[in-house]
Amino acid sequence: QDHPVFCYLPADPGICKAHKPRFYYNPASNKCKEFFYGGCGGNANNFKTRDECHHTCVASAMGRPT
């Protein structure tokens, strides 16, 4: 498996209403995309920065021997 399991979870804003800009990994495009997080609930596919998302979910598949 190339990515951590939580990278495949859908973006989940949770049940609260804080409307915080966050990033999630989109496996279909192999890119990190912005979404708005409510501040509670949700899942682990939720990163404060695009770089953190990229390092965790995109870069984890790069540079591995085939």
UniProtKB/Swiss-Prot annotation:
Propeptide stretches in the record: 62-66
Disulfide bonds: 7-57, 16-40, 32-53
Lineage, highest ranks first: Eukaryota, Metazoa, Chordata, Craniata, Vertebrata
Main location: secreted
Any one cellular-component term (Gene Ontology): extracellular space
GO molecular function, one term: serine-type endopeptidase inhibitor activity
Modified residues (Pyrrolidone carboxylic acid): 1
Chain ranges of the BPTI/Kunitz inhibitor domain: 7-57
Sorted UniProt keywords: Disulfide bond, Protease inhibitor, Pyrrolidone carboxylic acid, Secreted, Serine protease inhibitor, Toxin
Family as reported in the entry's similarity comment: Belongs to the venom Kunitz-type family.
Source organism: Vipera renardi
Subcellular location: Secreted
Tissue: Expressed by the venom gland.
Protein function: Serine protease inhibitor.
Record-given protein name: Kunitz-type serine protease inhibitor Vur-KIn
